[in-house]
Amino acid sequence: MRDDRALNVTSEIGRLKTVLLHRPGEEIENLTPDLLDRLLFDDIPYLKVAREEHDAFAQTLREAGVEVLYLEVLAAEAIETSDEVKQQFISEFIDEAGVESERLKEALIEYFNSFSDNKAMVDKMMAGVRKEELKDYHRESLYDQVNNVYPFVCDPMPNLYFTRDPFATIGHGITLNHMRTDTRNRETIFAKYIFRHHPRFEGKDIPFWFNRNDKTSLEGGDELILSKEILAVGISQRTDSASVEKLAKKLLYYPDTSFKTVLAFKIPVSRAFMHLDTVFTQVDYDKFTVHPGIVGPLEVYALTKDPENDGQLLVTEEVDTLENILKKYLDRDIKLIKCGGGDEIIAAREQWNDGSNTLAIAPGEVVVYSRNYVTNEILEKEGIKLHVIPSSELSRGRGGPRCMSMPLIREDL
């Protein structure tokens, strides 16, 4: 790893040095039962306790020597670089919020510019803006009157504490993702401005392996770095096969890349298998925690550079068990640790609460949710060091420690 690189992630388990989180905010308080489907939530977390749990997560990482950065802070700092950048950010945010009324757009621009502190403005954008919060808002136009019942001008963004999905660090670059749903695709604007304008990243020659303007979808929960040469990507409920090809072309043909193969895993299209990392994460050099439903046989496609056609890919289909695929490409014996010990009922329960979604902070050392006690006991018996965090409220969003974190720098193995 070069010391001057702002980003460096070449594995899932290298010692974690810097991570990006989002502390749950008022967007959680703006969830109501009627909005759950629209905002992709199954339940309403209790914000006070969710914050306490998230703070415990962040403190666990700090005590392990990890630098913890926050999405909301970096976004606010990024737009402080110039008023032109700030106004562009505000305008783009409003457009992507789906605001069609010109009067509402003007009112929102005035409202956001009324904040003297950029951090408070960003927090408000994330939390959502109610119509009643806009100064002198009157329902005079046809648009305003027809849409009078819905309370928000800009929807809240409760999924933001899952920082894994809007972008993903791969090597010394990122995929700035196009999310499957409009609700979540709005989240990627923060990463766009952070990596283009924040002093920490501006001018650092960060390659973008994928861009949020692409029309096909890619989400960070489907991107797992198996080694400095192999990237695994799930073809899932949230990630398209076309996106995997676009990513592979840019990554494999980049002049300074170490990656040689992209493995595309076709996984079931269902809520329980939403992303690859909900059913499969690495915990040590040779150990992975998995949902029993993904052990295979699986359809896996190996994407490599085509030696006879520059700029093109060779795609090779393989049908085999997960263990055999990993053994072949990592060139070592593999131990799969089944969520819930393989028990059908326990596995389903703990999988629902992300028992297979762990965050490695070093080889053989991971962060896990307390509620998945059966899987946790099995991990400990396999020699894995656990950092157990409280999880009664955070888990209501259906994401675990890996979902809630985006590594920016890991030590190379």
UniProtKB/Swiss-Prot annotation:
UniProt-annotated location(s): Cytoplasm
GO molecular function, one term: arginine deiminase activity
Principal cellular location given in the protein's record: cytoplasm
Keyword set, alphabetical order: Arginine metabolism, Cytoplasm, Hydrolase
Catalytic residues of the enzyme: 403 (amidino-cysteine intermediate)
GO biological process: arginine catabolic process to ornithine; arginine deiminase pathway
Record field: catalytic activity: L-arginine + H2O = L-citrulline + NH4(+)
Broad EC category: hydrolase
Stored InterPro entries: Arg_deiminase
One Gene Ontology term, aspect cellular component: cytoplasm
EC numbers on record: 3.5.3.6
NCBIfam families assigned: arcA, PRK01388.1
Database matches in PANTHER family: ARGININE DEIMINASE (PTHR47271:SF2)
HAMAP family found in the cross-reference section: Arg_deiminase
Family, as annotated: Belongs to the arginine deiminase family.
The protein's name in its UniProt record: Arginine deiminase
Organism whose genome encodes this protein: Clostridium perfringens (strain ATCC 13124 / DSM 756 / JCM 1290 / NCIMB 6125 / NCTC 8237 / Type A)
Taxonomic lineage from the root: Bacteria, Bacillati, Bacillota, Clostridia, Eubacteriales
